[in-house]
Amino acid sequence: CILPTSTVYCEGQKYVSKLDEIRQVEDFLHRQGVERLAMVVASSIGADLAMAFLTQTKLPVEHAFFDGGQFAQIGKGTRRIMTPFLYFAIRSLYWSKGGTLKKILWCDDDSIKPYFISAGKNLTYTDLRRQISDSLEDKPFPPLPQKLQEHTYFEFGSKEEHFKYRQAVMEAYPCGHYPVFEGYDHMQYQICDPKGFAGMLTHIAERDCMPELPFIRK
């Protein structure tokens, strides 16, 4: 189950709350007849929704993988101030046909531009404001059972800004796994080598360990 960042970037959706986002995901899974999840995968700010999902879903989850998780704990006032700046940054991706992507992300690869352009097109200020109001909150991380921690991977690239959250996450979930992709930037492996990234996730789900990759910090 690959958790979305949020439905605020999807056409025709309205953001109500994080709980409603989780309900939509669970309803979808139930309609598909899903009774267990081999793995939950989340990237960047999608980590916020995924962590809430993991702590509240009744579906059995065998593994979880976070790629460059946005685990910031930001005060309510700061989140309110940052909302308009974030809105214009994301909307600019649509207005510029992806031309401003390099200002937001480390790369502007043509293979990922359409997704960011679509996100910028669909985003409304009201939906983003509602999402930010109950995301990245300045409160302790939700507890994860030790057994699930032992099968959860919090991966960060050594060059990415989100690497700064690694220590706090390690303290919150001491039984988790914390691979570092040496020399890699934010989500770089899944962007540059999606087949390799998918193969890595399959290896974890099937063998319960990281594969031998040359760029994993020893």
Each language-model region and where it sits:
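Catalytic histidine-centered segment of alpha/beta-hydrolase-like enzymes
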Residues: Y184-F197
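Conserved serine/cysteine hydrolase catalytic core
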Residues: S133-E171
